[in-house]
């Protein structure tokens, strides 16, 4: 079967290698036990109020553009009142009105072991006694670097930065420096941060707000950015032919999470590796989202494909600001001060981020981690799609390990153009309904969802039951 998002209540299966087939076929069967809710649905609806969030958000709009510090948080694409979060723990969040939510955003991916993990908090408290920022090398950088290098197949050396955007900026500059070529290929709907060169047919908040690009990006900054539809190897071949000898790299999300959840077809992901090798072009996996989430070694371990360079973020900081890029030693040795490609950062290698990352990765390395994520995410995704089928809503969706997504569309969804066929107005109604039920999904049809080790079977069952109620009334 092809690696697509399938409709009518069927979750994603992969067959691009025997390893992946075995992994999917051996996934634990879903356990549809009946869970008694401690608070009735009517009581929950009656008590649901966002008055304090509304007041605080109205004040915020006079202080910050749109009232937020990242656009998708403003709920513009889903409507309704943005919630202001007061605290988090495990799989739950509480807003300033006291409402509790089962959280499937996980701070947009980092909270894979659960929010405010006790061991991570204790380790951070110990590190903070020594200081919050050194602006100098520390042993914690060595520890996390060794963990990343031992885990991620493509990484022989790594450079820590402060965000996924920084990581992608650095890796593109490095690819251009190493190849002495300036053009690169990205895919429509893939998001690699908000640096000028990447804001062309981008996903994430750009897609959420329905923007083609962004004002303020000079044409010169994107003149060497080439784009192709995701999962379209022929389009890449045509770009290679049209710009022979001019392309430095191809960068992609190995599983798209910023146009919704879109996996690669086996033909595409394998063909892309061979095509870049044949043409002397560097292959870059942007694993800011998929790194340490699909498997301990990320998407490249999961698919059995080793890129030349990789970007990381989110999980490797355990919820603190972080990013990283790494790859082959001969390429990475071009980075200053070892080489001439300059990149620097005041807070890079921050001891708090290193500490949180170390303890998060230690937890993820424990036996059974990814089997558990696969089990609960399979049950969640299948349950939501089955609820859509029961209530007569065309839906499609899929999952890999602790990452999932669904669209209000027949499907299949192979690329950004397909994802935009989704009924975003219906998704908005679904999102708002689930919020009232105490379930927090990403406030955009064009963002993937995440499970964590803190999510319980009860969380999953309550979410599925809530989804069926909401879908029956929208």
UniProtKB/Swiss-Prot annotation:
A single BP term in Gene Ontology: protoporphyrinogen IX biosynthetic process
Position of the signal peptide: none
Subcellular location: Plastid, Chloroplast
Cofactor note: Can use both pyridoxamine 5'-phosphate (PMP) and pyridoxal 5'-phosphate (PLP) as cofactors.
Induction context: By light. In etiolated seedlings, initial expression is reduced but after further illumination, levels steadily increase.
Annotated InterPro entries: 4pyrrol_synth_GluAld_NH2Trfase (IPR004639), Aminotrans_3 (IPR005814), Aminotrans_3_PPA_site (IPR049704), PyrdxlP-dep_Trfase (IPR015424), PyrdxlP-dep_Trfase_major (IPR015421), PyrdxlP-dep_Trfase_small (IPR015422)
Catalytic activity: (S)-4-amino-5-oxopentanoate = 5-aminolevulinate
GO cellular component: a single term: plastid
Name of the top EC class for this enzyme: isomerase
Transit peptide residues according to the UniProt entry: 1-38
Pfam families tied to this protein: Aminotran_3 (PF00202)
Metabolic or biological pathway: Porphyrin-containing compound metabolism; protoporphyrin-IX biosynthesis; 5-aminolevulinate from L-glutamyl-tRNA(Glu): step 2/2; Porphyrin-containing compound metabolism; chlorophyll biosynthesis
Enzyme Commission number(s) of this protein: 5.4.3.8
Disruption of the gene: reported phenotype: Suppresses partially the ENF1 disruption pleiotropic developmental phenotypes.
Cofactor (UniProt): pyridoxal 5'-phosphate
UniProt xrefs under PROSITE patterns: AA_TRANSFER_CLASS_3 (PS00600)
Keywords: Chlorophyll biosynthesis, Chloroplast, Isomerase, Plastid, Porphyrin biosynthesis, Pyridoxal phosphate, Transit peptide
GO molecular function: glutamate-1-semialdehyde 2,1-aminomutase activity; protein homodimerization activity; pyridoxal phosphate binding; transaminase activity
Recorded family membership: Belongs to the class-III pyridoxal-phosphate-dependent aminotransferase family. HemL subfamily.
Function: Transaminase converting glutamate 1-semialdehyde (GSA) to 5-aminolevulinate (ALA). Involved in the biosynthesis of tetrapyrroles.
Xref: PANTHER family: GLUTAMATE-1-SEMIALDEHYDE 2,1-AMINOMUTASE (PTHR43713), GLUTAMATE-1-SEMIALDEHYDE 2,1-AMINOMUTASE 1, CHLOROPLASTIC-RELATED (PTHR43713:SF3)
The protein, known as: Glutamate-1-semialdehyde 2,1-aminomutase 1, chloroplastic
